[in-house]
């Protein structure tokens, strides 16, 4: 079958393309911006990529067009597909029909921690000999790829609540039909498609409805929003983590790099790893619990996590120059920002932390979280806020609310120079954005190298 993918360079669609190729299909695709690393990865799989959306790419017609959720009416290829009655579907629907319907699906959902927890779970299964397939929104550190078919019935998928396509406004995850479902947490996000938290809760309950009676749902006991979702009806076995839950963690180190795992009042394992932060301890509990549902004992899961390499862009050290460390993190929501900073603070103690933030997500651009942003940055000693052209509100408003020194700029080169000037030996620079941030990491490392300080 010839499958053509519109919007192929997105993380999800790129992963779907790799899976389609591994299934033996001829795969082509197009996108507005074709660039490495995704373009290189796809081409290495024998996938032809076309830049732009000239409808001529659809002649002769492929057997199926998979339309990414970034595509909308008015796109030349979309209009051609509709006008010529070509067979089309969404990415999540394709995944279900061509792959997931034959698998034991382990889905990881929630506002935060999906990619990291999915990666942990995939690695636990791999390390314990289960050879799972997976599709995750990031490059898995232990695998070097974001998707693979796997050699067993088990398939780990990052279950996103974002909409499926312009013609299917349901959340992606309602297509996945998991037997094992992790719901990590739930807060308001994606203000571009959801009006309020209640709208997201409805989608999460649609997801709960798809889990079979012999399935299992895993969630934190103290998350009020998820408690509300489950109270609307649940027909599957449930296990909970945290206070009053079956699964608990006892930290043996302040930064979360060493902790015990307890199940129903009994210690069942110990994790010692390179990750830090209470949020990662919580993620680990969920991954261990999900792996247990398919047969992995907690002690083996804990041992596997000791060999876990985190996904790129999760407190990833990009380099260290003259004693100044530069980290990259995907955090783009106040809760994630606060947790990431807390993890770094516990790791480095009293060392100076400079938080560098680009408010780039669709929700951030609308200013939805700007009132809580300053408080989320409280663990930083200094704050640098970038003013992208694409947002209508001023980051100066957030800077004014910060208790620590806070600086703003709309010029990336001046911004980098100012950060480098404030750094000294021992400083930890944490860059947070869900985009490329105009290559700031490389620019910072260059500026630090050129610095005489």
Language-model segment annotations:
Residues 32-35, 53-55, 71-72, 221-225, ...:
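Short, polar loop motifs at secondary-structure junctions
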Residues 251-269:
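Acidic-glycine-rich active-site phosphate/pyrophosphate-binding loop
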Residues 28-31, 50-51, 88-91, 108, ...:
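General beta-strand structural signal in soluble alpha/beta enzymes
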Residues 260, 279-280:
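C-terminal accessory "lid"/substrate-recognition subdomains
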Residues 1-34, 43-49, 61, 65, ...:
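ATP-dependent carboxylate-amine ligase
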Residues 19-22, 43, 57-60, 69, ...:
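Phosphate-binding loop of NTP-binding sites
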Residues 50-53, 91-96, 134-138, 233-254, ...:
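Beta-strand->loop->alpha-helix junctions that form or flank phosphate-binding loops
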Residues 37, 59, 98, 142-143, ...:
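Generic structural signal for helix capping and beta-alpha/helix-loop junctions
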């Amino acid at each position: 079958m010839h499958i053509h993918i519109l919007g192929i360079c997105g993380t999800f669609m790129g992963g779907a393309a790799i899976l389609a190729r591994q299934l033996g299909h001829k795969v082509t695709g197009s996108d507005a911006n074709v660039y490495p690393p995704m373009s290189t990865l796809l081409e290495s799989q024998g996938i032809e990529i076309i830049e732009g959306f000239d409808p001529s790419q659809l002649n002769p017609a492929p057997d199926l067009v998979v339309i990414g959720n970034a595509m909308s009416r008015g796109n030349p290829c979309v209009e051609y597909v509709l006008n010529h009655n070509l067979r089309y579907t969404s990415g999540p629907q394709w995944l279900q029909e061509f792959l997931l319907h034959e698998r034991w699906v382990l889905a990881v959902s929630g506002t935060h921690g999906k990619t990291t927890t999915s990666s942990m779970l995939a690695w636990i299964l791999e390390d314990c000999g289960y050879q799972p397939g997976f599709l995750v929104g990031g490059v898995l550190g232990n695998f070097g790829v974001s998707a693979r078919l796997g050699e067993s019935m088990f398939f780990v998928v990052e279950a996103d609540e974002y909409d499926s396509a312009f013609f299917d406004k349901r959340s992606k995850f309602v297509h996945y039909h998991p037997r094992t479902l992790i719901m990590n947490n739930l807060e308001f996000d994606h203000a571009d498609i959801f009006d309020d938290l209640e709208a997201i809760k409805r989608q999460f309950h649609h997801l709960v409805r798809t889990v079979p009676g012999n399935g299992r749902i895993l969630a934190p006991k103290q998350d009020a929003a998820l408690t509300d979702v489950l109270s609307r009806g649940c027909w599957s076995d449930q296990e909970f983590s945290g206070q009053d839950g079956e699964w608990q963690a006892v930290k043996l180190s302040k930064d979360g790099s060493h902790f015990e795992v307890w199940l129903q009042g009994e210690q069942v394992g110990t994790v010692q790893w390179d990750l830090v932060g209470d949020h990662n301890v919580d993620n680990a509990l969920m991954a261990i619990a999900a792996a247990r549902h398919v047969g992995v004992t907690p002690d083996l899961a804990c041992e596997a996590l000791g060999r876990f390499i985190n996904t790129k862009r999760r407190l990833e050290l990009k380099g260290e120059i003259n004693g100044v460390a530069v980290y990259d993190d995907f955090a783009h929501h106040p809760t994630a920002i606060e947790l990431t900073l807390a993890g770094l603070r516990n790791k480095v103690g009293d060392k100076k932390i400079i938080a560098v933030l680009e408010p780039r997500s669709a929700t951030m651009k609308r200013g939805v979280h700007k009132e809580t942003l300053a408080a989320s940055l409280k663990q930083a000693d200094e704050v640098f806020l970038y003013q992208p052209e694409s947002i209508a509100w001023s980051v100066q408003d957030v800077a004014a609310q910060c208790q620590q020194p806070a600086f703003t700029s709309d010029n990336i080169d001046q911004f980098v120079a100012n950060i480098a000037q404030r750094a000294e030996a021992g400083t930890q620079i944490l860059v947070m954005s869900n985009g490329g941030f105009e290559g700031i990491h490389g620019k910072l490392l260059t500026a630090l190298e050129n610095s005489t300080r």
